[in-house]
Amino acid sequence: MQIQNLIAALAGMAVVAEASVTFLDSPLSAALAKRQNKGGNNNNNNNNNNNNNNNNNKNNGGNNQLCLNPNNVQKGSQQAGTPKQGQANSAVDQANFINFCTGQQLTNGEQKTAGSCNGVVMGKIPSQNNMVSTIIKNPPPGGNLQANQQFNVQLKVNNLQAGSFTDAQSTYYSAPQDTNGAGNIIGHVHVTIQDMGNSLTPQNALDPKQFVFFKGIDDAGDGKGNLQATVTGGLPAGNYRVCTMSSASNHQPVLMPVAQRGAQDDCNKFTVGGNGGNGGNGGNGGNGGNGGNGGNGGNGGKNAAVNSGNADNGGNNDGGGGGNDGGNNSANNSGSGNKQGGKQQNGASTGGFPGTSNQFPGKTGTGSGAQTGNANTKTQAGGSASNSATNGNSGTGGKGGATANAIGGIQAPAVTNSGDSSRPFAVNGNTFVNKAAAVQRACDIQRNGCFDAINRGKLTGSTADCDAQLQTCTQQLS
């Protein structure tokens, strides 16, 4: 019995000794490892796989486990394709690129302006019969709106279950695109408006960091695809592009099943405060009567005043000098006449914004944009042209300011002298015919910066503070 106890004690000491040197490169440690693994890999595999499965299967029945289910491996990612000349080889990976973001800054549900890597899968793709399609109904292409007057951007979207809008500050791109029981993408639509400067046909692409209006439509509209976003306070006079950006719930652009298709989004170009009204081929008098093609030609209709010396003086009248006198401002007739790039159309301009050439040839303006200037009224055969002067957005009170006390230190850009007598005011390289429009633009830029900072979580408070500051900014810069 004593001998048995002694043997057992010696065996125990041997086990302790072996355990103390398992990390040393020795025959003893190798033998112990082999004995523990029963051939090398079984225990490791069991431990690794079982532990991963046991630990991670507790969440949603295994949907969030850290190992890739072999059934989900896509062989399409394992080959580079057969590119034609000039095409590129695809990147390849044996495991769906699950570790593509290793060592990089992760997106992690945040809007990281310096760039990041997002490892979340793309998600469910709709069928070809369920592809998203959008049309912007208002503002219409080539439309002209009144300056500084509220309007609605109106859309019709097909095959999107709208109204699903997650927290953009903590769940940005953090979940896959999903579809509903009908096969339509679940998500929402963003609307963005950008200033195009002095032309509706610029030669350079617009800066995506610059926009005058942005809205994520987080409601379902009428449930039939009709959505809208309200542009409170309207826009100052200028040339603009409005576009949609259809998104899944977590704000990623919607993904479609085929490459060759129509676009899922839409854009329209329009003007605000342009020289259109009821002139040209239509309106009050059309192409007949009243000695000069046209009723209310030139700056006719309910069009804006003066434009700081840029009045049209009757547009490009080919009708023999009769009837198209509209808006002829005796006090400020030193402008260039804005002949719309030489495009003549029966004695009237084509409805574009002052100082802009070749805008939608053949289009007549629809609006009655009001701009600062000397109010004038001129009665003429075929109708009257009313030039009303407004100052827009004067407001009182509010928080912050244009420069001093600006919320978050986000200041409005300066209103400067452009050196162009026809458009003497400038803001960030864009020129304006009057100071009120320039001030409005500067304060809108500050407002957008304030909105962006609050939406990104860089500032505390609410976007209502940004709206309140807009009024103060306008007062101070005016």
Swiss-Prot record:
Residues 1-19 form the signal peptide. Residues 35-89, 299-400 are annotated as: Disordered. One of its GO terms (cellular component) is extracellular region. Disruption phenotype: Leads to virulence defects. Keywords: Glycoprotein, Secreted, Signal, Virulence. Residues 65-89 have a biased composition (Polar residues). This is Pathogenicity cluster 5 protein d. The lineage of its organism: Eukaryota, Fungi, Dikarya, Ascomycota, Pezizomycotina. The gene is CLU5d.
